[in-house]
Amino acid sequence: MERLKAVEEKWQERWREARLFEADPQPGRRKFFITFPYPYVNAYPHLGSAFTILRVDIMARYKRMRGYNVLFPQGWHATGGPIVSSALRVREGDPRIIKTLRDMGIPEEDIPRFRDPRYWVEFFTKAWRRDLERYGMSIDWRREFYTTSLNPAYSRFIEWQYLKLREKGFVGKGRHPVVWCPKEQKVVGDHDRPDEYAGISPQEAVIIKFRGRDGLVYPALTYRPETVFGVTNLWVHPDATYLVAEVDGEERWIIGEQAARELADQGHRVVILERIEGRRLLGRIVVNPADGREVPVLPASFVRPDLGTGVVMSVPAHAPYDYVALMELKRRPETLREYGLEPGVVESLEPIQLIAVPRAEGLLVVEEVRRRGVESQMDREKLDEATREVYAREFYEGIMLETTGRFSGLKVAEAKEKVVEWLEERGAALRIYTLPQEVYCRCGARTHVKIVEDQWFLLYSKPEWKALAREAVARMEFLPGHVRRDFEAIIEALRDWAFTHKGELGTPLPWDREWVIESLSDSTIYMAYYTIAKYTQHPEKYGVEPEMLTPEVFDYVFLGAGDPGEVSRRSGIPQGLLEEMRREFLYWYPLDMRISGKDLIPNHLVFFIFHHTAIFPRELWPRAIGVNGWVLVAGEKMSKSKGNFILLRQALDWWGADATRWAEVLAGADSGLDDANFEPSVADSAVSLLSQWLDFVRENYGRPARREERWVDRWFESRLNSTIARVTRLMEEANFKTALVEAWYKLQESYRWYLRRSGGEPREDLLRRFIEVQTLLIAPFAPHTAEEAWEAMGREGFASTASWPEPDESKISPEVEAAEETVQAVLEDAREVLSLIGGADTLVVTVAAEWKYRAVEAVRRARERGASMKEALREAFKVEGVDKREAARLVQQLSRAPEVLRRAAPRSVELEALRDAAQLLQEELGVKVVVETEEDGGSPRRANALPGRPALYAEKRGG
């Protein structure tokens, strides 16, 4: 372990000295610009963030070795409320935040310094950079910056961006529903809340008023107002406390406390009159405003008084929870008696079907509940699944029945809005915004929806902006490809976005400076800023002060607008430097790839696309997005309480950089949304295998060895070159786990087999080539080890900038590789045969008759043309000179063993391979091995031979 750490420190220092990863424009050379979302700097990096940035680094290193001029910059995100909130908590002496800092290893004497938000930013940007340097990231650090007004140069860039958006008509002002923290009195964006609450936004719902005989209003919040005609009762939680509140000075409502807060923050006057236990409401009678029917108030344990209004309208024909709760009450009359109700109150209540769905026999809700085996209203996971299925099918496929009166015959999607308008006209409904589930602020407070007046927002709902975003998505590459559909769907659903907050770190809105641009909105086109950050972040070198960065400067640099001489005169930036900045931007843009975690698809990545289309011409829109899942540790979500929360710096201390990188890749670093699973045992083994590889290189590179040609050399040379081709394709697809498995594990397996087949005597030039190729193929994954091996070979320069191996297509022979697979299969099968037949001293290996190869090839060609297996097998009967009975037997054999069709070795190659391997087979099996053909041999099992699958016969011959 210490040896590998010394190697890593050595090469990190060498890279720094050589300024190896600093990238400047080189006209005429292919460029590749790749980025990772800048992380929020209020804590140390953990294995999750390390996983995603590793995928960026691997792609950057690979492209560099492919000859590209690669730019991989990195900045830091400080915008938003969490840092301000944490600093305030330190000032207040909050023991939880003090403990968090201590647990991070912050010295006691330094904790008071965290009272200042600026110190948080400065401390954690340095910590992140140090950890990423130790991790082996190939970053151009000259372009480093952090966000907010603490960095005036970046703030000037953000101000320019929003002036352009306003100029183009993509910014508006008005009333807007936002997620609101009542404790900190601020808007709560995705970055202001724990990850599990990201992406949850206000949704419009409808409150339907059921008026009671007692003079109270029982308001039921629903997302399905069209089902009001099927209400059989109302639900309340018997053990919850409700409020009797005067709403808008007109009515007294029964509601939960969360609903009271939400109503008050959405323009309603709410006066709390008294509190009342839910059980006191049971048995009361209310009137359905849709049809005048009287229905009872009943108990249900699934009701959450803190969601919606706490009063639920029961539609058992179309809501799984309602159906199951009603059936439970019918089965358990003792529950009703417990609350002083007679069982007869539910006996007459039956589901009222309102909607017909194609292919549903009877009530869809009953079908889905039974299919999932739901037994009670506490089977929440199954009920949630059933609810999603029922709601989706009824919304998209359902037709309203005669039980809905004037709405009969309408599609559900059409009826929904018409029912709301009808109820509103009758004074029986109002619209409200709410959250579909509870959402907490990072400060720990429960949030709700508030209508903010005079709020600035981005007009993502504008048809012309959505059209641009759609066009960009159609032009882009996505890894994996199927996420394109997610982006398309989110673009369609995206609503206007409140982009300003108060009391946070960030950039003030240039025309209304009491507002600050929130964290997801100042992080959309900063990739463009990277291209000039080496100038703007270093006034000591280039003389560009923040106040010189006027909107006209950015107009020229990023859009080519204006005369550079005039812009220079007005800004004070030398014309030559302005033109150099413009050239630098045009060289690097557009962004070639952005790699991110899947959690940023619904917000950051979609915003990134929208903003690029709004500001830049089409030729400068992003080219590709790669997405990956999150990281589990030993199969479980990382959690401090479980003891499996691993910081990157801890991993680097325990295993070093390359072993940590290795284990992160094998955790699941292919393109896709599946979560990766980091196994500490894999990191342990990586420490050993990387050390062993360095020993192997030192002991074997350049040593004298065999020079004459053997059969197995052709196979290993083919494997070497076909591996390069496969790994190259996988790297282009960002399928890094599969690439590493091919590049290391399968190639090592091939080398071990090569050693066995060659009697421990590899050919000298192939041994050298193998060591070179193996080292270069693992260089993006374990760069420090690769550098050390490269130096041990006596090679010049760095492995990091050496040329990626190119496959020699003339040396790749699928036939030879298939023939050697046959040898390996024969060895494996023969062990099994000999273990079953004791006492045998001879193994007869029979290669199939020549006509079978021709027949199999005919069948294979037919399959490649798209013929069915049945049609393709008929081709076997058409081969010239084939006995029909023999062909029929072959067809039966192929039906049982279709894998034979995947083999590609001609008979002559297969026969040559087996005869060459006879000596190895004899040595490993301990018996005499005879290789013969089906035509000339005498084995009683010779007729069973198939191309690529020789027949084996063990016997005792003696002598």
UniProtKB/Swiss-Prot annotation:
Gene Ontology molecular-function annotations: aminoacyl-tRNA deacylase activity; ATP binding; leucine-tRNA ligase activity
InterPro entries: aa-tRNA-synth_Ia, Leu-tRNA-lgase_arc, Leu-tRNA-synth_Ia_arc/euk, M/V/L/I-tRNA-synth_anticd-bd, Rossmann-like_a/b/a_fold, tRNAsynth_Ia_anticodon-bd, Val/Leu/Ile-tRNA-synth_edit
Chain span(s) of sequence motif 'HIGH' region: 39-49
Disordered as annotated region, ranges: 933-959
Motif ('KMSKS' region): 637-641
Keywords: Aminoacyl-tRNA synthetase, ATP-binding, Cytoplasm, Ligase, Nucleotide-binding, Protein biosynthesis
Subcellular location: Cytoplasm
Alphabetical list of Gene3D superfamilies matching this protein: Class I aminoacyl-tRNA synthetases (RS), HUPs, Isoleucyl-tRNA Synthetase, Domain 1, leucyl-tRNA synthetase, Valyl/Leucyl/Isoleucyl-tRNA synthetase, editing domain
SUPFAM superfamilies reported in the protein's UniProt record: Anticodon-binding domain of a subclass of class I aminoacyl-tRNA synthetases, Nucleotidylyl transferase, ValRS/IleRS/LeuRS editing domain
Catalytic reactions of this protein: tRNA(Leu) + L-leucine + ATP = L-leucyl-tRNA(Leu) + AMP + diphosphate
Residues annotated as binding ATP: 640
Gene Ontology biological-process entries: leucyl-tRNA aminoacylation
Superkingdom: Archaea
Keyword Aminoacyl-tRNA synthetase: yes
Listed EC numbers: 6.1.1.4
Enzyme class: ligase
PANTHER family referenced in this protein's UniProt entry, alphabetically: LEUCINE--TRNA LIGASE, CYTOPLASMIC, LEUCYL-TRNA SYNTHETASE
Family that this chain belongs to: Belongs to the class-I aminoacyl-tRNA synthetase family.
NCBIfam families: leuS_arch, PRK12300.1
Protein name: Leucine--tRNA ligase
Organism: Aeropyrum pernix (strain ATCC 700893 / DSM 11879 / JCM 9820 / NBRC 100138 / K1)
Name of the encoding gene: leuS
